[in-house]
């Protein structure tokens, strides 16, 4: 990941703390053993692109999935047990089957008017912290 992209994503995360982005995520905190779980995100900004990011401890956020106009763009390095679902343009789900300790991280949902980070502002939710024990 380039330093420029990392800086951009970091600034977006800081900006999120300062404004009401109208993006909600649930649950906020989740501690569980090896089970199946779903994370939910909903945006009320009229955006047509939605994203899931994973931020593991002491690592930069990693783009997992992008839906643009309900079309999926997948990061091929993401394990197949992560399954995104976009039931409509304002909601994005992340289903995780057979949760593994390496899945412990904060999962951020984001949205934007268009695909990609060039020229588009990403608006982030507060994150869902998943701890697998």
Swiss-Prot record:
Gene Ontology BP annotations: adaptive immune response; cell surface receptor signaling pathway
Positions of the UniProt region annotated as V segment: 22-113
GO cellular component, one term: T cell receptor complex
Matches recorded under InterPro entries: Ig-like_dom, Ig-like_dom_sf, Ig-like_fold, Ig_sub, Ig_V-set, TCR_beta_variable
Residue segments, region J segment: 114-133
The keyword Hydrolase belongs to this UniProt entry's keyword annotation: no
SUPFAM superfamilies: Immunoglobulin
SMART domains: IG, IGv
Disulfide bonds: 41-109
Pfam families: V-set
Signal sequence region: 1-21
Keyword tags: Adaptive immunity, Disulfide bond, Glycoprotein, Immunity, Immunoglobulin domain, Receptor, Signal, T cell receptor
Name this protein carries in UniProt: T-cell receptor beta chain V region 86T1
Organism encoding this protein: Mus musculus (Mouse)
